[in-house]
């Protein structure tokens, strides 16, 4: 019988460069195995076809993962114009064709039209749930579920390369944006079809692909070297204001009480809390009407002291 490596408490964030061909969950489990971590989760699904930045949260960092899921993101997408696929990407079958002799001017106009605050219908091949099941399970059976359009923001679409029928675009967008659908909508604006042949997430919440690490590189390191690549848990909430509390106020938070706090901040604002010696305590919510802090997500005492 083969003995499995003993799991250990690991706390922090690893910026993974997910390879093509792996689901986000498979990439997560491989990373978790390398670190022998007791608990792990990722922040935002990437399709198996897609590569790039996938922040992996270990241990106490999973408490704050939701704040990164909601962050803006950036992608580099490669489109093939003139062909629609059943999945919106290269993994599906070609189901329709149209003109592919698109001019750069036409493509630029379409990209401009899809920039800004827009509404987007999520694709059937997505992890969104309907009656407890992800939409892609219905799609694989040929069942189409009606989806409501959602408000998203496309901050910028920059054309990195254009040689029809191939186009490469850099997209900066809000959470919940489906690049496959965006590519199809760009083509629809021109009067043709398109599908993705490659997709790479290059940025999320200020983290860039240059900061990430491949599974292969991680496997070639020893445990101490791998651990040195972990970012502290509070990087996930670095965009929130911070405050320092004395030991008594920190104790109050941990006991479910609400220490006094007064700042020029909107009510309900999450605030990063630190001890006087710089340890991250967690997130608290500012209740402006009573000038108090209410605990939202707090680090485990032992992890906070580490």
UniProtKB/Swiss-Prot annotation:
Catalysis performed (reactions): uridine(55) in tRNA = pseudouridine(55) in tRNA
Residues making up the signal peptide according to the UniProt record: none
Claim: Protein biosynthesis is one of the keywords in the record: no
Coiled-coil residue windows: none
This enzyme's EC code(s): 5.4.99.25
Entry annotation: catalytic residues: 47 (nucleophile)
Pfam family, one: TruB_N
InterPro entries noted in UniProt: PsdUridine_synth_cat_dom_sf, PsdUridine_synth_N, PUA-like_sf, PUA_sf, tRNA_psdUridine_synth_TruB, tRNA_sdUridine_synth_fam1_C, TruB_C
Alphabetized UniProt keyword annotations: Isomerase, tRNA processing
CDD domains in the record: PseudoU_synth_EcTruB, PUA_TruB_bacterial
Lineage: superkingdom: Bacteria
Gene Ontology annotations of biological process type: mRNA pseudouridine synthesis; tRNA pseudouridine synthesis
One Gene Ontology molecular-function label: tRNA pseudouridine(55) synthase activity
Family to which the UniProt record says this protein belongs: Belongs to the pseudouridine synthase TruB family. Type 1 subfamily.
NCBIfam families the record matches: TruB (TIGR00431)
PANTHER family xref list: PSEUDOURIDYLATE SYNTHASE TRUB1, TRNA-PSEUDOURIDINE SYNTHASE
Described purpose of this protein according to its UniProt entry: Responsible for synthesis of pseudouridine from uracil-55 in the psi GC loop of transfer RNAs.
Record protein name field: tRNA pseudouridine synthase B
Organism of derivation: Neisseria meningitidis serogroup A / serotype 4A (strain DSM 15465 / Z2491)
